[in-house]
Amino acid sequence: MRVDLFDFELPEAAIALRPASPRDASRLLVVRPGETLADRGVRDLPALLNPGDALVFNDTRVIPARLSGIRHRAGGTGQRCEAMLHLREAPDRWRAFARPAKRLAPGDRIRFGGEGANQGASEVCVLSGLDATVEERGEGGEILLRFDLAGPALDEAIAGLGALPLPPYIAGKRATDARDTTDYQTVYAREPGAVAAPTAGLHFSDALLDGIDAAGIERIHVTLHVGAGTFLPVKADDTEAHRMHAEIGILDTATAERLNAVRARGNRIVAVGTTALRLLESATDPDGTVRPFSGATDIFITPGYRFRAVDALVTNFHLPRSTLFMLVSAFSGLDTMRAAYAHAIASGYRFYSYGDASLLFPERAP
C-alpha cells in the first residue's frame, strides 16, 4: 500500500509534552466501526468491558538507554557521539542507533560517561566510564556495540550512565527531568529491557487496576521489550519496502493457557497497546490458538492482515505515516481511523506517548 494513504495533518499543539495527572484522567475515544464515535475517559474502561474479558499488559520496564560518549581512534582526535540502545543481542552486545553514525567505523572505541558524562543520566554512577567497540555499522545509523562489561555488570553500568530515552517529539521540545522517570514508566513495569515505554499502559493507575479487578476483568502480563525502532519514520513510498526492526518478546506456557481459556469461555482478549498486540499476534496460530513464545518478532501489520488473537485494543494516538497508525488502520479500518483521528484533532485530544487513549474494536469482514 502507498504510505501516503496513512498521512494526515497534525497541529503541533496537539502533541502532549506531559501526561495527564493523575494517570487515569486521560480521555478515551471509543471507536466501533460503523457506529458513532464516543468520547469517554480512561476511568470508564471497566464499564466498557465485560466480566471475564482479559486485559493484556506489556510489563516491560524502560531502561536508561541513551548513552553519550567520546569516540577514540588511533591517530585521530576524539569525537562526541550518542548511542540509543535498541536490541540486546548477547550479554555484552547491543544494537544501537548512533549519532553521528557517519563518524563511526568498525574497530572504533567509544568511552561512554566519564568526563562529560551524559546530560540527564539516571543517577550518579561510581564508574569512571563504560567502554565499547563498534563491531558493525549498518543502514540508517545502526551500529553493533560490544561492551567491555557483560550481563548484570553491564546492566548496572547502563543504569548509572544512561539517560531516559524520551521520544524525539518530546525530547526535541524540552529537557528530560525527574518527573519523566516516573511518568514514562507503567506502574506495573517489572522486566527491564525496553528503550521506549509501552505508552498505552501509562494511563493505568493503581486505582484503575483495582477497578478492573472489581469489575471481574482478568489481568494478564506479557513482555515485549520495545525498541527505538518504534520512533523511526517510514521512509519508503510503499509499505512493501519497509523493514521493521525486531523486538524481543516472551509469552510463557501458563500465560498461553490463560489466554486460550479466555477465548474458550466466550470472552474477549483486549490488548493494552500495540506492543502487546504484536506479541499476541506473533504467538498465535491461524486457528486462534495462543502458543508460548520466546524470541524476536518483526511482525509488520498493515490493512489486509487477518487478526488472530485480539478482540479489542487500547492504544494512544499515533504519528502520521507511522507503522503504528498502519496497525490501527488494519485493526479498525483505514477510513474509520482517518475519521476517528479527524474527530480527535477537532475535539482537542492529546497525541503521542503522553497523550490520550482510544479503545478500538475491529472491522468485521462483510
UniProtKB/Swiss-Prot annotation:
Subcellular location: Cytoplasm
Metabolic or biological pathway: tRNA modification; tRNA-queuosine biosynthesis
Gene Ontology BP annotations: queuosine biosynthetic process; tRNA wobble guanine modification
Keyword Methyltransferase set for record: no
Alphabetical keyword list: Cytoplasm, Queuosine biosynthesis, S-adenosyl-L-methionine, Transferase
First-level EC class: transferase
GO molecular function, one term: S-adenosylmethionine:tRNA ribosyltransferase-isomerase activity
EC number(s) recorded for this UniProt protein: 2.4.99.17
Cellular component annotations (GO), alphabetically ordered: cytoplasm
Major place of residence: cytoplasm
Catalytic activity: 7-aminomethyl-7-carbaguanosine(34) in tRNA + S-adenosyl-L-methionine = epoxyqueuosine(34) in tRNA + adenine + L-methionine + 2 H(+)
PANTHER family on file: S-ADENOSYLMETHIONINE:TRNA RIBOSYLTRANSFERASE-ISOMERASE (PTHR30307:SF0)
Reported function: Transfers and isomerizes the ribose moiety from AdoMet to the 7-aminomethyl group of 7-deazaguanine (preQ1-tRNA) to give epoxyqueuosine (oQ-tRNA).
UniProt record similarity statement: Belongs to the QueA family.
Subunit composition and interactions: Monomer.
Name of the featured protein: S-adenosylmethionine:tRNA ribosyltransferase-isomerase
UniProt organism field: Methylorubrum populi (strain ATCC BAA-705 / NCIMB 13946 / BJ001)
Gene behind this protein: queA
